[in-house]
């Protein structure tokens, strides 16, 4: 999680980029779970034109299946607060969904939820982890479930959102 480095670290990164860019334009992107973002971070992103990727695995019941804090408490409400802040500060952002065994069973519901949030940029990546024996972990999405998930999302996207919502894989 890059926010653990603190905002001063990224302010320094930006200063070094300006110092050494030699007139070249640099585009910065920042992927985060969103938990530690605040108004200062949002102002920094807006003022410096950074694209922010926020990890959101669906509505609360889908997201909070695996996205909990160190105490095991759900994080969906904090991510939604972050999204509201990004919108308020007019920061360009996209949503990245880690597709796992649980949320892969709900492609239409998940996509509709993301549609309602209004961001035109979406990414889906499969969770594929292996246990010590080389077998897929219990949380991982199988290849069949991943394919079905993408088909379900694509069916809605191609009918309703083509040219309006950009899904990285389509």
Predicted segments, located by residue:
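Canonical radical SAM enzyme core domain
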Residues: 2-52, 56-62, 69-81, 85, ...
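Radical SAM enzyme [4Fe-4S]-AdoMet core and its adjacent flexible, acidic
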Residues: 65-77, 84, 88-170
């Amino acid at each position: 999680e890059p926010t653990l480095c603190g905002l001063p670290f990224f302010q320094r990164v930006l200063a070094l980029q300006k110092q050494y860019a030699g007139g070249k334009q640099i585009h910065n992107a920042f992927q985060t779970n969103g938990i530690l973002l605040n108004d200062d971070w949002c102002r920094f992103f807006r003022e410096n034109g950074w694209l922010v990727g926020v990890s959101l695995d669906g509505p609360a019941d889908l997201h909070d299946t695996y996205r909990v804090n160190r105490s095991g408490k759900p994080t969906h409400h904090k991510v939604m607060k972050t999204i509201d802040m990004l919108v308020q500060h007019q920061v360009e952002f996209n949503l990245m969904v880690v597709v796992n065994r649980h949320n892969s069973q709900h492609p239409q519901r998940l996509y509709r939820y993301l549609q309602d949030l209004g961001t035109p940029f979406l990414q889906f990546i499969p969770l594929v982890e292996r246990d010590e024996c080389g077998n897929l972990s219990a949380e991982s999405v199988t290849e069949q479930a991943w394919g079905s998930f993408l088909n379900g999302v694509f069916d809605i996207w191609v009918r309703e959102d083509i040219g309006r919502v950009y899904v990285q894989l389509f």
